[in-house]
């Protein structure tokens, strides 16, 4: 044993070293340890402890001094222990060397085959892709129901349909090739497009659920089903108004100049149906209210720009095509009766819209997702929006009641309901509650609107049963005669291959009819009357060809009576 080993220093048996802390010395069983200890006690000297100095020798690296009577068993260091540096041996009082550890970087873990998505605060959301596809599917079902309600209406042409189809005696384009069926199919396409645009506008203003409820209620209205099966420009005018409304909602966060996209649609609507002119001020107000939350004072610039461009386009249209006729015709209808009829045709939807407006004013959001970020519209803006949408439904009834003219009021009511229905959809959504807590309320409202709409449409959609009359006239008309009838447009349309529209004249009653009969200038006279007029009773110039009664006895239509010149 060297001096350094006796002083507690380090031994250097070779390049390999060992630590006592990790590799304790080898010991014999308990019996040998007791024997060695007994020998140490027997001498009574410090030699026993001197023998224990061999234990200190075991602290050398790569070398072990066994106890007396013990076999030598060397211990080898591992590969990781060979990184320790040579210790400092400056003297007997030198401190033990602190080894420097080599930190090994862990191997990178393999990429997982599947990563769980981030867990949202709630397991429910209204703005994910799945809800969007569900909304589209439900909208398609709503449009199919609307198409079915319109297709169930059938019959010969109305007088206004025939006038629209003849177009001053000349058919053109798609109508010329497809006739009445093609024109009605085109009207249905416009009506379905208006419902789809209404859903889009309501979804942008409120949410998808309110949009679906609004589209569902609008699709079963009597005016919607009627215009979808009525060959006229009313459905086109509704489509243009719905497109303008959707564009106003779509561009509410854009620059004020983006509102110019909606101006052409709004300006064209009155030239398709004059009643659409009543709703241009509503569109102007909505141009401001829809953008005020995002643009502030810039929303008024947007409204002024929309009003100016729309007015300029309307003025140009009047200069080119003239003023639409029929918008200010006075009548003798009872104003009270017109208001009652309007309440029957649109009262249910208007009531639900008022409920939705009140709920919207009281609370901006329903609270299904209280953690949703974003500022809510103010109470004043909510009040103005609800008042504008609900009040618009009253424009056509009040205006025509003031005129005393109930012509096509059952159709014009639908123009105002186009603007009130978004608030009605919001009302249905609020009444069902958060997360569809009370779905039976929405189902009940929809079924009630459906039943009422079907009954009213069947009552109002009663075209003249003119098939038998047209069949009888085919045998007596030609391109040279003159004909007097109560329905000149219908006769001119169905007999357009045999006659010209100018050959058909509108029949009057009283002295005018008596004078025409006495003059004998008409080759045939066709009247819808329950009894024979006095002027034709016993007349020697005309003979009665036939009396054609309608197939629908409950329709209230008078039979056709045909006289031909002798």
State each model region's role.
Residues 374-382, 428-455:
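Signature aromatic-anchored transmembrane alpha helix within multi-pass, membrane-resident enzymes
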Residues 208, 244-261:
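Membrane-interface transmembrane helices that cradle and orient dolichyl/undecaprenyl
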Residues 456-467, 473-534, 554-556:
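Short periplasmic/luminal acceptor-recognition loop of GT-C membrane glycosyltransferases, typified by
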Residues 250, 279-309, 327-333, 363-364:
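Perimembrane helix-loop-helix junctions
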Residues 214, 258-274:
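Membrane-interface alpha helices of multi-pass inner-membrane proteins
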């Amino acid at each position: 044993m060297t001096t350094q080993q006796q002083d507690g220093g380090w031994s250097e048996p070779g390049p390999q070293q060992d630590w006592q802390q990790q590799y304790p010395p080898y010991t014999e069983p308990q019996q040998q340890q007791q024997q060695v200890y007994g020998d140490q006690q027997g001498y009574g000297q410090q030699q026993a402890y001197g023998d224990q100095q061999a234990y200190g020798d075991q602290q050398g690296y790569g070398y072990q001094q066994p106890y007396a009577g013990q076999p030598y068993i060397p211990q080898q260091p591992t590969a990781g222990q060979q990184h320790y540096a040579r210790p400092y041996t400056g003297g007997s009082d030198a401190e033990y060397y602190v080894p420097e550890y080599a930190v090994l970087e862990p191997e990178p873990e393999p990429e997982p085959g599947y990563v769980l998505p981030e867990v949202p605060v709630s397991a429910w959301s209204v703005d994910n892709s799945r809800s969007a596809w569900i909304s589209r599917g439900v909208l398609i079902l709503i449009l199919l129901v609307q198409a079915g309600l319109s297709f169930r209406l059938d019959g010969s042409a109305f007088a206004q349909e025939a006038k629209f189809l003849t177009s001053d005696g000349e058919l053109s384009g798609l109508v010329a090739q497809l006739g009445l069926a093609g024109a009605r199919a085109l009207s249905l396409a416009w009506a379905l497009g208006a419902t789809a645009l209404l859903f889009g506008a309501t979804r942008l203003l409120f949410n998808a659920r309110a949009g679906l409820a609004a589209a569902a209620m609008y699709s079963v209205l009597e005016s919607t089903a009627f215009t979808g099966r009525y060959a006229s420009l009313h459905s086109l005018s509704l489509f243009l108004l719905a497109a303008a409304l959707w564009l106003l909602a779509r561009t509410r966060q854009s620059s004020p100049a983006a509102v110019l996209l909606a101006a052409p649609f709004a300006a064209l609507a009155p030239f398709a149906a004059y009643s659409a002119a009543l709703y241009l001020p509503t569109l102007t107000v909505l141009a401001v209210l829809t953008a005020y939350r995002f643009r502030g004072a810039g929303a008024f610039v947007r409204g002024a720009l929309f009003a100016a461009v729309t007015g300029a386009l309307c003025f140009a249209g009047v200069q080119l095509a003239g003023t639409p006729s029929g918008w200010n015709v006075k009548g003798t209808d009872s104003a009270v009766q017109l208001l009652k009829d309007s309440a029957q045709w649109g009262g249910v939807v208007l009531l639900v819209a008022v409920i939705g407006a009140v709920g919207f004013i009281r609370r901006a959001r329903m609270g299904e997702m209280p953690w949703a970020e974003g500022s809510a519209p103010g109470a004043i803006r909510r009040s103005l929006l609800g008042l504008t949408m609900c009040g618009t439904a009253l424009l056509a009834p009040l205006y025509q009641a003031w005129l005393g003219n109930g012509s096509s009021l059952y159709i014009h009511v639908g123009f105002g309901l186009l603007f009130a229905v978004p608030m009605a959809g919001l009302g249905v959504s609020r009444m069902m509650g958060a997360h569809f807590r009370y779905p039976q309320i929405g189902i009940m409202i929809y079924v009630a609107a459906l039943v009422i709409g079907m009954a009213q449409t069947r009552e109002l959609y009663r075209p003249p049963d003119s098939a038998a009359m047209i069949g009888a006239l085919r045998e007596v008309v030609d391109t040279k005669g003159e004909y007097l009838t109560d329905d000149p447009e219908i006769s001119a349309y169905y007999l357009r291959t045999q006659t010209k529209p100018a050959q058909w004249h509108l029949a009057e009653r009283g002295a005018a009819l008596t004078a025409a009969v006495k003059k004998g200038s008409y080759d045939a006279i066709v009247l819808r009357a329950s009894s024979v007029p006095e002027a034709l009773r016993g007349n020697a110039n005309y003979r009665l060809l036939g009396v054609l009664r309608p197939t629908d006895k409950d329709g209230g239509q008078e039979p056709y009576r045909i006289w031909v010149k002798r």
